[in-house]
Design a protein with these regions (language model features):
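An N-terminal assembly and electron-transfer interface module characteristic of large anaerobic redox
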Residues: 1-288
Length: 288
């Protein structure tokens, strides 16, 4: 988690009479023991199944999703309130204090663009939720992580808004989405960003530029919009770069050639046959 997010979560919990504890996975066994003394566990990144299993064995209740955007935070506060049997009045007062601030932060920096989201961090779904609440169209969300019951709420929320959510997404899945959707911005891993740039589409590295900022609460709503809008504004520069480098080749024909590129069609054909043979052999083994 981004270092500021536990503080942002703590600010949401404070009016409920609660506090944020240790962040897990942790570095020291002392922190793990302190974490096991908690009243409940927020599975903010719901893919740490081994860590969650330890808390389940210790009899601790697990809360899925995360306090992102207005709807996500509203639902999360309800879940926390139910877990700790907090009075409805206190829950209502907490919402009145927190939710308008998040809404204002989202309204101040509207994102009226189409964005694809992919990565391997585990926070892709909650980032997409925040972007949609900020006004963005997000047709595709891909995560390399598996589907777990702690991400079900986020998945259902996204799918109800027409988002295609892909768990265990491959690089091919992510690149295919970028090509077919032709977004105003592609957020993804290094090869996804490289492919988007080749296509002249503004792009952001998920790990460096999305995970490296707060996502939760009021701070998260504002900080995400800032970097997104700045990247989208580079669209015309990307088009200029694409036209400037047009005709220099790509893949194994990239670069400046004095003559024709040294293509090796016979080598490609030979490799294709070898790959096909391996596929046939693998299929035969499955049948056995």
């Amino acid at each position: 988690m981004f270092p500021a997010d536990p503080m942002n979560i703590g600010a949401i919990l404070e009016p409920l009479g609660l506090a944020a504890g240790q962040v897990i996975p942790c570095r020291e066994w002392r922190e793990l023991y302190a974490a096991l003394d908690c009243g409940a566990v927020a599975a903010i990144h719901p893919f740490y199944t081994a860590a969650v299993r330890e808390f389940e064995d210790a009899g601790k209740p697990i809360i899925g999703s995360a306090p992102v955007g207005v709807e996500g935070t509203n639902s999360w506060i309800d879940s926390v309130g139910d877990t700790f049997n907090i009075a409805k009045k206190i829950i209502g007062e907490t919402k009145q204090k927190i939710l308008p601030q998040i809404q204002k932060s989202l309204d101040d920096k509207k994102i009226n663009n189409k964005i694809t989201v992919s990565g391997y961090e585990g926070s892709e779904l909650i980032v997409a939720r925040t972007l949609i609440e900020a006004g963005a169209q997000v047709p595709y969300v891909g995560t390399a992580c598996p589907k777990t019951k702690w991400s079900t709420e986020d998945k259902d929320w996204l799918e109800s808004r027409g988002v295609f959510v892909k768990f265990r997404a491959s690089l091919e899945d992510d690149i295919s989405a970028v090509k077919s959707v032709n977004p105003d911005l592609a957020i993804g891993t290094t090869p996804v960003v490289q492919k988007a740039k080749e296509l002249g589409i503004p792009s952001l590295y998920y790990t460096n530029l999305i995970s490296a900022r707060p996502i939760m609460g009021v701070a998260g709503a504002g900080s995400l919009a800032e970097v997104i809008l700045q990247a989208i504004s580079n669209g015309s520069r990307m088009e200029k770069m694409k036209s400037f480098f047009e005709g220099v080749g790509e893949g194994d024909t990239a670069g400046v050639w004095e003559g024709e590129p040294n293509l090796k069609p016979q080598f490609r054909a030979h490799q294709a046959k070898k790959i096909e043979k391996r596929k046939i052999a693998a299929k035969a083994e499955e049948m056995i």
